[in-house]
């Protein structure tokens, strides 16, 4: 009887964690949370119980990369400053990119996001009907206003034409920041934070929702970023902490004890 009650309790906890994550978490993350709660259970056991409950993590999808053409002058500015760099603090490296968001009635929208590479936190974003340099700068200015980074910050991005524009590069310079690009013929891991973020947004959130208009898309994305991704979504690379909790842990270790 005790074993039956114990298993029932674990099954309930697995379901609670699963539904609290909106069906996003699989056995690795659920196991990590259970262990943090003091429940000693293996990932294999959690996986088996999830099969018993007939639940599973939302599966990933493949999103093709955009291709862009560059002039010889533009190719000359392509330098990757974060390759082999030890990224060990917030506001050391930001990454940014654009991804496509499809709606039923308002067509294709464009989401520009800035991520703190250290914590994977979304620090500035903008949803637009266009993908102009001015749209990029709206998201950039939001991130700067929120984070107030010191000079020397590295802004790393893909090779899209907006990021290669003189206006954008000059804006980076005016803030006393450095710009960095993924290399020509690069592998996707050179902008891995953005690739991972876009995949998470689309497979975990947008794939289960219908977006009819711009307003629907904006509200849905804001709900994911502010309500789940930043404060709650745990990452294995962050020691199974959320981006906000990872930053809190970093700053708590830097604060001298009284």
Tell where the protein language model's regions lie, with residue ranges.
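Basic, flexible linker segments flanking DNA-binding modules
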Residues: 1-90, 187-188, 242-251
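Mobile genetic element proteins and their domesticated derivatives, centered on retroelements
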Residues: 14, 30, 46, 50, ...
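RNase H-like two-metal-ion nuclease catalytic core shared by retroviral integrases
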Residues: 69, 157-159, 165-168, 181-202, ...
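An active-site-proximal beta-strand-loop segment
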Residues: 87-123, 129-131
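Active-site beta-loop-alpha junctions of metal-dependent nucleic acid enzymes
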Residues: 107, 126-148
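Short small-residue beta-strand/loop micro-motif enriched in glycine and branched aliphatics
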Residues: 121-125, 179-182, 207-208
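C-terminal domain-tail junction helix/linker
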Residues: 173-175, 200-258
């Amino acid at each position: 009887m005790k074993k039956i009650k114990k298993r029932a309790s674990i099954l309930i906890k697995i379901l609670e964690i699963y539904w609290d994550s909106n069906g996003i978490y699989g056995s690795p993350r659920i196991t990590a949370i259970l262990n943090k709660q003091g429940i000693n259970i293996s990932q294999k056991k959690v996986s088996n119980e999830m099969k018993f409950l007939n639940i599973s993590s939302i599966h990933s999808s493949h999103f093709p990369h955009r291709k862009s053409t560059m002039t010889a002058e533009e190719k000359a500015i392509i330098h990757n400053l974060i390759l082999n760099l030890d990224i060990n603090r917030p506001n050391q490296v930001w990454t940014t990119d654009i991804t496509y968001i499809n709606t039923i009635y308002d067509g294709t929208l464009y989401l520009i996001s800035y991520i703190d590479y250290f914590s994977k936190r979304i620090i500035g974003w903008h949803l637009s009907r266009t993908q102009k340099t001015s749209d990029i700068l709206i998201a950039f200015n939001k991130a700067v206003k929120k984070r107030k980074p010191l000079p020397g910050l590295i802004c790393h991005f893909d090779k899209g034409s907006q990021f290669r524009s003189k206006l954008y590069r000059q804006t980076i310079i005016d803030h006393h920041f450095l710009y960095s690009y993924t290399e020509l013929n690069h592998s996707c891991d050179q902008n891995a934070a953005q690739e991972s973020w876009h995949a998470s947004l689309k497979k975990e959130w947008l794939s289960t929702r219908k977006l009819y208009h711009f307003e629907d898309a904006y509200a849905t994305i804001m709900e994911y970023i502010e309500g789940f991704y930043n404060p709650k979504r745990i990452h294995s690379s962050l020691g199974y902490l959320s981006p906000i909790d990872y930053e809190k842990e970093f700053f708590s270790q830097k604060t001298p004890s009284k």
